[in-house]
Amino acid sequence: MPTVFTAAHLWDGDSLLEHPILAVEDGRILSISTRATAESPSTPNTLDFPNATLAPSFLDVHIHGASNHDVMEATPAALDSIGRFLASRGTGHYLATTVTAPVDDTLRSLSALAKLLNKPADESPIARPVGIHLEGPFLSHLKRGVHPPEHLQPANIALFDRLYDAAEGHVRLMTLAPELPGAPALATHATSRSVRVSVGHSNATAAETRAVIAAGAVSATHTFNAMRPLDHREPGILGVALSEDSLYAELICDGIHTTPEIVRIWSRCKGPHRAILVTDAMSATGMPDGEYRLGGLTVTVANGRATSGGVLAGSVLTLDRALANFLRFTGSTLEHGLRLLTTNPTALIGSPGLAPSPGHIAPGLPANFVAINPDGSLAASFVRGQQAS
C-alpha cells in the first residue's frame, strides 16, 4: 500500500504546487496530485505536514565529512556514518570532497572511494556520494587556507590524470587556482574529461580568472573565502565570481565564514539560478566541541568555529541550517532558497546519469525529499521513502 504525504506546498524543482498529495511506494514516487484535482486520501498510511513545503532532498557539492568521520578515510563505515547523519539533516546526495595531502595518500583515498561508489546502492535511508570534489592540490600558496603548503602542486595535467584515473572517473568537480602556470590548459583538459572546474583558493587577478573561465571553468569555490579581496582597480577573482553571470558561486552561509551583509551582496549578484549553498563541513559536524581531523590536519572546534592554527578549517554547518540562515539574512522566498541547494548544484554537476534527480521530485524518481517549515528549518527528511533520523 502506498504511503501518502500531504503538505501546504510542494516544490518539485521547477514549480510550486499548493495542497499537494505525494504518493510513495517501494521507495519511489508513485504520483503527484493536488487536493484541487484529486480527492483527499483515505489511507492509514498518511503523513501530513500542514504548514510545511515538500521539496527535493539537498545536494552538497562541497563537504569533507561529518559524524566524526572524514571522507578521505574512504571506508564503508565512514561513509555510512556520514550518510546517516547527512540524511537526518535533509541532504540526500553529496560530493565527497578531498583536502590537499601527500599525492600517494590522495591516490589511495580516491581509489578506495571509487570502489565504494561503484557498488550498487542499497535501500538504507542514508545520503550517498554521487561523485568526488577535488579540493587541492592545484591551489595557491598565498590563499591555501589550511591546505598544507608542502603538498600543493603546480597545474599539472599528468598528475590530474593520475588522480582522475585513481577515482575511476568519479571526479565531478575540481577547485583550481587560475594564476597557476598552466591553469587554463588544465581547465580545458579537465573539462574534456567531464570534470567541472571551479576557481578558488586563489590570489588571481581578474584577467587570470577570465582566462580560466574561457578555458572551461564554470563555478567559484566558497566565494569570498580564500580569495583575493575585491579592489576597485583590480577586482580580482572575487570581482569576476560576482559579476560573471554564467558562473556558479558557492557560499558557506554560517555567519562565521560570511556575514549577513556579504550573503546579501552574493545573493543579489548571483540571483536565484547561479548561487549554490555549501557547507564545507568537516568531521566535527554533528559532534560536540573538541579536536577532530580534516584530512591529515588536527582541527579544534569551539562554539561552532573550526580552526587549525588560528585559520578557519571548514565548518560544522548543515545545509538545513544554511537554508534557514539564508532566508533570515536575505528575506528571500523559500522557493528561492531551495534552488540554491537542489536544482542549482544539480545543474552544476549534472549529467544524463543524474538529471533530473537529485534536485527534482517527479513520478518514478527515488522518493528523496524533505519537509521544510516556513522559516527554512527542517521538519522531516525522507530517503527512498523512509524517514531519516
Language-model features: locations:
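Active-site glycine- and acidic-residue-rich loops that bind
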Residues: 102-108, 179-181, 198-203, 252-269
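Divalent metal-binding pocket/active-site signature
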Residues: 134, 141-157, 161-236
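Residue-level marker for buried hydrophobic side chains located in beta-strands
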Residues: 57-59, 198, 275-278
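Divalent metal-dependent hydrolysis catalytic cores, especially in the metallo-beta-lactamase
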Residues: 64, 80-109, 126-140, 167-179, ...
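Active-site-adjacent C-terminal substructures of enzyme catalytic domains
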Residues: 208-341, 348-355, 372-377
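N-terminal metal-binding scaffold of metallo-dependent hydrolase/deaminase domains
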Residues: 1-40, 382, 386
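C-terminal cap of metal-dependent C-N hydrolases
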Residues: 355-389
